[in-house]
């Protein structure tokens, strides 16, 4: 456990706790190495790095309020009521602690476990990276009744040399205050980013997620660019991750009223690992496990998820044996049966996090698995044995037994899906027009709505690297079906075979035949429905294709503008307005479907990599995506109708993150 001496050391967070590792020179040269991209995702990553510093104060018990404000000029303010960045003079660098944190890469109290027990920052480099990539940064620290301020700016000198994150003047005391904490204002540099406009909904969703993960902490969000009711929002969840699971299951039918919740700790001092788990089964067929470490979403899972799954399987099999649900002669049920319809949130707090790869989305610490397994075994077992919870335990076991029967029914269908030789005579033959290229990294698969458009696409494509799979009917809504029903559907089976990866538990990314999978559908309600059905299929059964960046949506033009022999295509209403501004004597054609374009037009506008627009499908907020898929594709009609009425605009593309040529 965390000792009193340890807690005292953490309260005594001072300038001496700041460790310096290297300088800041490379950030402007290669920003992608630090924030991933200079597009929308990288822009928001800047905000997350400052927010996570504030959240770390809350996670370690030193702050209760975190607020974010987006101003009309696109500058952003992040404020907390924590301890405040140390303002004393650093012994080695002879400048204030604030200046060290914002000008030195790998500088901060997070490298010292006495200052932070748990930290979710970008290996401590976040503040300095934000400074390097901003037009200006202003930091105010309120501590000990005094207010301190320092401003940094980035500028180009007369010789054209760029200077990034330079202090305008040293940290100065500017007044007295009753406040406590840190306030950071920054303006992302438009010389670095493709856009400096933060997406209000992206920010709100992430702050809501953080509020669920940090029980009792208030997150305030103000967007001064807005004038509607969404200008000011506030999130606080006294139920923490229990409320989170209730939100995730809000459009589903739970099997028991209240989520199961337990918490435990393993290890002491800097080796302490705190585990929080909330879980609830519903009557659906897919498992939805959301894992986090120090508030960081681990969308690819890792050792903590593995530990949760293995312990849950053992605890439930032991329960089924004790209660006679499983006889002595019966084999134990596999974990997937106990996880059918499960919604769970697994949240860890630990120091010295180790991630696999550079994305920080898969936890690699072996001790995390051991801790989670032990805590699940110790905490879940007595919950199930409590007579008050007999209905709950029976519901989980009954669900698993039914899943086992369905799994056996699906075994033959799964085998067929895996064995190419048995599927070569399936409906796929004569349907897929494959490409001649044998390099998956270069090959593209277009999944096209309708035989008519599919025929034009087959004629217009570059058959060296582009394959065409027309859909003759609507794919199955997999949200409402078990896997054996999915495998019986011709359209789904054709897609599975074309991809080559298998699905679900049998998915193997290394077998992917096409590294770009492009959905082509009409720009109308039917086309939107088909896109939704396909994306639901990919999300539920081949999620790694989305997280790996392999799934795209093609953006065919909405309009053809012709004046004389000159033809121009417009992909949305705004582009049409720009093209036709001041133009006279033109003819306008509104495309109602892909089938209205001949092969040459389809190649020129939609297939040709030199001209086309693609939208990459990404998962920025896994929990929100889960909620939305359930809302739009699940059984409950009223909330779906309400959402579509409020949000649907089938010609909008600006909600997508990046267009890719």
Give, region by region, the residue ranges found by the protein language model.
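GHKL-family ATPase ATP-binding module
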Residues: 1-17, 24, 48, 56-58, ...
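Conserved short strand/loop->alpha-helix "switch" segment adjacent to the catalytic nucleotide/phosphoryl-transfer site
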Residues: 29-47
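Residues immediately C-terminal
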Residues: 56-57, 84-85, 525-526
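Short conserved segment of the HATPase_c
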Residues: 85-108
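Surface-exposed acidic, glycine/proline-enriched linker/cap segments
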Residues: 101, 107-113, 164-166, 308, ...
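C-terminal interaction appendages of subunits in large macromolecular complexes
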Residues: 405-424, 439-444, 455, 459-461, ...
């Amino acid at each position: 456990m965390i000792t009193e001496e340890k807690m005292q050391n953490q309260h005594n967070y001072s300038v001496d706790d700041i460790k310096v590792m290297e300088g800041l020179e490379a950030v402007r040269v290669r920003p992608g190495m630090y924030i991933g991209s200079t597009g929308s995702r990288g822009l928001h990553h800047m905000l997350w790095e400052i927010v996570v510093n504030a959240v770390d104060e809350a996670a370690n018990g030193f702050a209760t309020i975190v607020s974010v404000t987006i101003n009309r000029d696109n500058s952003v303010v992040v404020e907390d009521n924590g301890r405040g960045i140390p303002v004393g003079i650093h012994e080695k660098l002879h400048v204030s602690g604030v200046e060290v944190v914002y000008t030195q890469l790998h500088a901060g109290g997070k490298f010292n476990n006495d200052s932070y027990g748990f930290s979710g920052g970008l290996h401590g480099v976040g503040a300095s990276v934000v400074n390097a990539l901003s037009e200006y940064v202003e930091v105010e620290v309120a501590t000990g009744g005094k207010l301190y301020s320092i401003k940094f700016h980035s500028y180009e000198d007369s010789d054209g040399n760029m200077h990034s994150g330079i202090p305008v003047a040293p940290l100065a005391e500017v007044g007295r205050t009753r406040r406590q904490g840190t306030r950071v204002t920054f303006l992302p540099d438009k010389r670095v980013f493709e856009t400096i406009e933060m997406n209000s909904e992206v920010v709100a969703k992430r702050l809501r997620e953080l509020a669920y993960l940090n029980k009792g902490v208030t997150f305030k969000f103000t967007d001064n660019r807005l004038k509607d009711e969404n200008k000011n929002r506030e999130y606080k969840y006294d139920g923490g991750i229990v409320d989170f699971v209730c939100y995730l299951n809000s459009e589903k039918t739970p099997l028991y009223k209240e989520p199961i919740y337990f918490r435990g700790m393993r290890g002491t001092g800097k080796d302490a690992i705190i585990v929080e788990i909330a879980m609830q089964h519903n009557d659906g067929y897919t498992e939805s496990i959301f894992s986090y470490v120090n508030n960081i979403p681990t969308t690819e899972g890792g050792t903590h998820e593995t530990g949760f799954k293995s312990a849950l399987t053992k605890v439930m099999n032991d329960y089924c044996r004790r209660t006679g649900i499983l006889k002595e002669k019966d084999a134990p049920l596999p974990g997937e049966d106990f996880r059918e319809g499960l919604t769970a949130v697994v949240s860890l707090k630990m120091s010295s996090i180790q991630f696999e790869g550079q994305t920080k989305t898969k936890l690699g610490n072996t001790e995390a698995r051991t801790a989670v397994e032990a805590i699940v075994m110790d905490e879940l077992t007595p919950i199930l044995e409590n007579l008050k919870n007999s209905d709950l335990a029976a519901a989980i076991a009954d669900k698993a037994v039914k899943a086992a029967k369905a799994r056996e029914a699906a075994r033959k269908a799964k085998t067929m899906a895996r064995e190419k030789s048995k599927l070569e005579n399936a409906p796929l033959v004569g349907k897929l027009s494959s490409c001649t290229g044998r390099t998956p990294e270069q090959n593209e698969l277009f999944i096209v709505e309708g035989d008519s458009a599919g025929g034009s696409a087959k004629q217009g494509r570059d058959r060296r690297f582009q394959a065409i799979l027309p859909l003759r009917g609507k794919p199955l809504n997999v949200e409402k079906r078990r896997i054996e029903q999915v495998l019986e559907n011709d359209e789904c089976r054709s897609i599975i075979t074309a991809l080559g990866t298998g699905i679900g538990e049998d998915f193997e990314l290394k077998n992917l035949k096409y590294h770009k999978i492009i959905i082509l559908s009409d720009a109308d309600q039917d086309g939107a429905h088909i896109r939704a059905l396909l994306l639901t299929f990919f999300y539920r059964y081949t999620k790694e294709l989305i997280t790996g960046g392999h799934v795209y949506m093609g953006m065919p033009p909405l309009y053809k503008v012709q004046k004389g022999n000159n033809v121009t295509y417009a992909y949305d209403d705004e582009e049409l307005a720009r093209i036709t501004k001041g133009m006279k004597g033109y003819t306008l054609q509104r495309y109602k479907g892909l089938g209205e374009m001949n092969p040459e037009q389809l190649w020129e506008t939609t297939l040709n990599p030199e001209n086309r627009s693609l939208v990459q499908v990404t998962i920025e907020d896994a929990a929100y995506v889960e909620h939305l898929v359930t809302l739009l594709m699940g059984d409950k009609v009223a909330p779906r109708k309400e959402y579509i009425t409020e949000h649907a605009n089938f010609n909008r593309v600006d909600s997508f993150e990046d267009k890719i040529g």
